[in-house]
Amino acid sequence: MQSEANRHYLRASYDNKAIKILLVGCGGNGAQMLMGLASLDTALRAISSRSLHVTVVDDDTVSEANLGRQPFYPCDLGNSKARTMTERINLAHGLAWKAVHGRAPADVNVAAMDIVITCVDTAAARRAIGAAIDACEPEFHNLQPPAYWLDLGNRATDGQFIIGCPKASGDQPGRLPTVMEYFPELADESLAEDDAPSCSVAEALDRQSLFVNRVVASHALALLFDLLGRGSIGHAGAFLNLASGQALPIPLPTAPVEVAA
């Protein structure tokens, strides 16, 4: 049984509030996350004093290759992914979540968010988000950085999700490393990236397993439910492999992580 001391606890300031979430990306992982966040909002309202207000940002439109693996339909072809999914969620759940057809961080205010969730395809996109978060310096610009950064990523049959704390806060002595700290190679701009779009459903399924996004998103949502609904987590994410059926949790740091100067 895990020691109570080896857990990460949600800060008390998150009680009695609507937690502002920025969801970057509304494709494979992002659309699955958005649907799950709507369910999480319903659960939080029932068991706690918390709720969610989500802003979704994505500049992509629905293509034929997205059908099947992503929760879009033929009637959605050519439409904004962010607007299509957000309108559907708002209508079904009676919410007023916001969609931005654009890119983060250029078209949204990262500093206004409590949690940033990235469901992006490239290291460059993660670097841009990381730079925007790092630019939040309360003592100089009165900008409060997001308390958490949850990143999801996947390949053909495996994926991972990692939650971190970009900055330490007064009521949270330690923090969780972010995805940029777990994978410092993401900062290397010379690394080649494969973000070529698929042209058909068959090609998309050849590049990625049909349910890999759903599996990664479900595990990430379960972690968020423990953190926001139960108040603590015992791990910081996991590596998942659909081909082998294995899940390897990412342990919490054993000592507080110092914030880089």
What are the roles of these predicted feature ranges?
Residues 17-47, 55-63:
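Glycine-rich adenosine-cofactor-binding loop
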Residues 50-94:
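Glycine-rich phosphate-binding loop and adjoining beta1-alpha1-beta2 segment
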Residues 53, 96-98, 148:
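Conserved beta-strand segments of alpha/beta enzyme cores
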Residues 37-45, 71, 133-137, 228:
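Active-site catalytic pocket residues across diverse enzymes, especially alpha/beta-hydrolases
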Residues 48-49, 57, 120, 153:
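N-terminal Rossmann-like NAD(P) cofactor-binding subdomain of oxidoreductases
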Residues 100-107:
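Conserved SAM/SAH-binding loop
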Residues 2-29, 33, 112, 122-126, ...:
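Glycine-rich phosphate/adenylate-binding loop
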